[in-house]
Regions:
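An exposed, glycine/acidic-rich loop-and-rim segment of catalytic or binding clefts
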Residues: 1-344
Length: 344
């Protein structure tokens, strides 16, 4: 196994680095400390051909270009402080109301205007006999983006020879706050040769959070007999025609005790590639990327609608405003700990 670091660019006068993790099975993962972004995951297909199976860029400049930020899909980034939506950008903690920037219609999305996805994280390399990785750390000051408490947060990416990318999140706070971290990687197992409609997905989830205008109503509803039922493996495109904007739904994993559970598998028959998902999180957002922009990169048009599918393990959207949902509240003296594994 091998771990390397090279300069990737400059942000406000500070160097941005790119780390490459390679195992002994030709799985290679590239991560930058800007936004803790996974820029590339190369895996072999059934013929042994290694290609990048996620949406991302080879150059740092493309991550900060006006073209990309103008229709921003959060490729590969860590989302925080609060992944997904908070209704009207408002929540109450210990009797005090907090107001966040509204950046998605009438709601707050993915941590605000400058979330963790746009921060420069500190990086520490990890080299062990059975894994390699990087630990990325960031201190979010009190009231950054409207969230209370100074938050010390870390995201550790490790790769092993079982072809597992393990993401470990940890955080502590000095005031009661809310936290919901996720990774926003989009997978395309054809390496971008086609869209994701013929990818097959199996999910264990028996229910999802009902939503109106992307905000949970508070009800948990069964997937039985609906287009949202993936308990038996099926193609993403099979039932998508009846969904105006494709899939963008929070699945209930029935995992409120923080155990590591199997959530599902994404696979693609022509390449033989697959991604298994395991997590301690109670939910997972399935997002098929309807709003992904078509971008011109090095003179070539890339991405666009349905160019990748995100499997975002998370706490439920707007969970701070629903007492019947698993709580995203973190108090002083407590440690936030979550784990997600993508196995290739």
């Amino acid at each position: 196994m091998q771990l390397t670091k090279v300069p990737f660019g400059q942000l406000n006068g500070e160097q941005v680095d790119l780390f490459t993790l390679s195992n002994d099975n030709n799985v290679t993962i590239k991560i930058t400390n800007y936004g803790a972004i996974i820029t590339s995951i190369e895996t072999p297909d059934k013929k042994g051909v290694c290609e990048n199976i996620v949406c991302g860029f080879n150059k740092f400049e493309d991550y900060i270009s006006n073209q990309y930020l103008g229709s921003y899909p959060y490729f590969g980034s860590i989302i925080g402080r609060f992944g997904n939506r908070i209704a009207k950008g408002k929540f109450t903690l210990e009797g005090k109301e907090y107001t966040l920037a509204v950046n998605n219609g009438a709601n707050a999305l993915h941590g605000g205007l400058v979330g963790f996805d746009k921060k420069l994280w500190n990086a520490e390399e990890i080299k062990a006999d059975d894994k390699i990785g990087i630990k990325l750390s960031y201190t979010s000051p009190d009231m950054e983006e409207g969230y209370p408490g100074t938050l010390n947060v870390s995201c550790t990416y490790t790769l092993n020879n079982q072809n597992e990318l393990v993401i470990d999140y940890e955080a502590t706070t000095d005031q009661t706050t809310i936290l919901n971290l996720t990774n926003h990687t989009y997978f395309n197992l054809t390496a971008g040769k086609g869209n994701i409609m013929n990818h097959e997905l199996e999910l264990t989830a028996e229910a999802l959070t009902e939503a109106e205008d992307m905000i949970p109503t508070g009800k948990i509803i069964s997937v039985e007999g609906t287009a949202f039922d993936f308990r038996t493996k099926k193609k993403l495109g099979r039932d998508i025609a009846g969904l105006e904007y494709g899939y963008d739904n929070n699945y209930v994993l029935g995992n409120n005790e923080g155990r590591l559970v199997y959530a599902g598998t994404l696979s693609e028959a022509t390449t033989g590639r697959s991604v298994e998902v395991y997590t301690t999180q109670p939910g997972m957002q399935l997002y098929t990327g309807y709003w992904n922009p078509e971008l011109t990169i090095d003179g070539e048009k890339k991405f666009g609608s349905y160019s990748g599918v995100a499997l975002e393990t998370q706490h439920y959207p707007d969970s701070v405003n629903h007492s019947n949902f698993p709580s995203p509240i973190l108090k002083p003296g407590e440690k936030y700990q979550e784990k997600t594994i993508y196995k290739f």
